[in-house]
């Protein structure tokens, strides 16, 4: 499972102030940024 903390960290690295949301991709799960 994609953890929220991991998503948040990834999003902050690219876009500070955003939160991460886990979405299902063909290869496992991937984190995307949501404002």
Swiss-Prot record:
The cellular location(s) given in this protein's UniProt record come to: Secreted
Q: How is expression of this protein distributed across tissues?
A: Expressed by the venom gland.
| Keyword Cytoplasm carried by entry | no
Q: Which UniProt keywords apply?
A: Disulfide bond, Ion channel impairing toxin, Neurotoxin, Potassium channel impairing toxin, Secreted, Toxin, Voltage-gated potassium channel impairing toxin
Q: Does the keyword Disulfide bond apply?
A: yes
Q: Which cysteines are joined by disulfide bonds?
A: 2-22, 7-31, 11-33
State a GO cellular component annotated for this protein: extracellular region
- Write one Pfam family the protein is assigned to: Toxin_32
Q: What is its main location?
A: secreted
User: Which Gene Ontology terms cover its molecular function?
Assistant: potassium channel inhibitor activity; toxin activity
Q: Which family does it belong to?
A: Belongs to the short scorpion toxin superfamily. Potassium channel inhibitor family.
Relate the protein's function as given in its record: Blocks Kv1.6/KCNA6 potassium channels.
Q: What is this protein called?
A: Tamulustoxin
> Native species of this protein?
Hottentotta tamulus (Eastern Indian scorpion)
């Amino acid at each position: 499972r994609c953890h929220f903390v991991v998503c948040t960290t990834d999003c902050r690295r690219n876009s500070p102030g955003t939160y991460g949301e886990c979405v299902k991709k063909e290869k496992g799960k991937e984190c995307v940024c949501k404002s």
